[in-house]
From Swiss-Prot:
One of its GO terms (cellular component) is plasma membrane. It comes from the Bacteria. GO terms for molecular function: carbohydrate transmembrane transporter activity. Disulfide bonds: none annotated. The keyword Nucleus does not apply. This is Putative TRAP transporter large permease protein HI_1029. It is a multi-pass membrane protein. Belongs to the TRAP transporter large permease family. It is found in: Cell inner membrane. The keyword Membrane applies. Pfam families: DctM (PF06808). The chain crosses the membrane at residues 3-23, 24-44, 54-74, 93-113, 139-159, 169-189, 217-237, 241-261, 275-295, 312-332, 334-354, 355-375, 399-419. It comes from Haemophilus influenzae (strain ATCC 51907 / DSM 11121 / KW20 / Rd). Keywords: Cell inner membrane, Cell membrane, Membrane, Transmembrane, Transmembrane helix, Transport.
Length: 425
């Protein structure tokens, strides 16, 4: 009965158009009433404690760093360098999109922000040079979901806080899978580009290449500083967010001179709005998570799936199928916040490495961002490309299929995630 009430209230409020954060709060109140211990004080305490975490402080700083990079010219220069490197090849703009998305993923950690930036700069160019727009939009959207995997990843921070898993280990574990995702996308795009008569650009001269590299080197130093810093223990992921913001601000103001001081309040306001949405979502999910634990839903799930605990691979397949279905109708962050406290006891009892599970979980929920009917990234590329939704969805299907195959590969070959993590550590 508890499960039915939980799902009915949650899905019912979302279908009615209630924002997810408020839907989670209403769901928490409904569970309290069902369990017959409604207490406004506990509700307020859980709401406040949900956002009261040192690790969560990384989120507003990385969001602010991303806003500064977009306004301060760093994103533009990051795209210019891959253009000079591979823009002359057949289907070169596709390779530029993949490389740009991977580099920007290592700066902001947001799939929606990265996709919007790359799509706004490259899709018009791809359209005018004869690229099939639905395939181009699909490629850029899929490249955008590399952002939650390559550090610094906001979803990894959310999962780490919700599960108690080391955020630093999650960051390090995401590097190699993120690179594999980019390489697989490039291979698929190359195969598609060979079948299309796409316009090529003239090859950049060495002088142009050197100038582009020199112009973008300050932007490219940011991921090196961030990853190198928490890898060597100089600062935590939270402190890395502060460093990223400060560095992006200095470069934008005093080196590239593209962020006037009068525009800074607008940048701060945009970052504050995004942060408020994310943090209220986290706080509301903490209320629901607390009541899920009180209602012993994780214990019920463990009992239900107990026969599969002896076979972790089958258990992972069942969990990932459920997460994939939920990810089709729910955004990444609420999916992580709702399911993590339910699934982690089961994962731990089955002896599955929590860092490995975290990477699979975030990859799966990221795939949900490009999966119809709700995918946020799919909606972004639909808006930027001005394609009908069904055409954008059609264009993304080959890449979506490839990402699902990659997820299955990681499930059956966990060493692809665990061994590189051991090497990096």
């Amino acid at each position: 009965m508890t499960v039915i009430i939980f799902l009915s209230v949650l899905l019912g409020t979302i279908i009615l158009g209630v924002p997810v954060a408020f839907a989670l709060l209403i769901c928490g109140i409904a569970l309290m009433l069902h369990l017959d211990f409604f207490n406004a004080q506990i509700l307020a305490q859980q709401l406040v404690s949900g956002a009261d975490s040192f690790s969560l402080m990384a989120i507003p700083f990385f969001i602010l760093a991303g806003e500064i990079m977009n306004e301060g010219g760093l994103s533009k220069r990051i795209i210019d360098l891959p253009m000079k490197l591979v823009g002359h090849k057949r289907g070169g703009l596709g390779f530029v999109a993949i490389l740009s998305a991977m580099i920007m993923a290592s700066l902001s950690g947001s799939a929606v922000a990265d996709t919007a930036a790359v799509a706004a700069m490259l899709l018009p160019m791809m359209k005018t040079t004869g690229y099939p727009i639905h395939r181009s939009a699909g490629l850029i959207g899929t490249a955008g979901i590399i952002a939650p995997i390559i550090p610094p990843s906001i979803p990894f921070i959310v999962f780490g806080v919700a599960s108690g898993v080391s955020i630093t280990k999650l960051f390090l574990a995401g590097i190699f899978p993120g690179v594999i995702m980019g390489c697989c996308l490039a291979i698929l795009w190359r195969w598609q580009a060979k079948r299309l008569n796409l316009m090529t650009f003239s090859k950049a001269t060495k002088q142009d290449l050197c100038f582009s590299f020199k112009n973008s080197v300050w932007a490219l130093m940011l991921p090196v500083i961030i990853i190198g810093g928490f890898r060597s223990g100089i600062f935590t992921p939270t402190e890395a967010g502060v460093v990223a913001t400060f560095y992006a601000l200095i470069v934008s103001l005093f080196i590239y001179h593209e962020l006037p001081l009068k525009h800074l309040p607008k940048v701060l306001l945009a970052a504050a709005k995004t942060t408020a949405v994310v943090m209220f979502l986290v706080a509301s999910a903490n209320v629901t998570g607390y009541l899920i634990t009180v209602a012993e839903l994780p214990t019920m799930l463990t009992i239900l799936l107990e026969p599969l605990i002896e076979n972790p691979t089958i258990l992972l397949l069942v969990i990932m199928l459920a997460v994939f279905v939920i990810g089709m109708v729910m955004d990444l962050t609420p999916t992580v916040l709702i399911l993590t406290p339910v699934l982690m006891p089961l994962v731990e009892e089955a002896g599955i490495d929590p860092v490995y599970f975290g990477v699979l979980f975030i990859l799966n929920t990221s795939i949900g961002l490009i999966t119809p009917p709700v995918g946020n990234v799919l909606n972004v590329i639909t808006g930027v490309s001005k394609l009908p939704f069904d055409q954008a969805a059609k264009g993304i299907m080959p890449y979506l299929g490839m990402m699902i195959m990659l997820l299955l590969t990681f499930i059956f070959i966990p060493e692809l995630i665990l061994m590189p993590l051991q090497w990096i550590q």
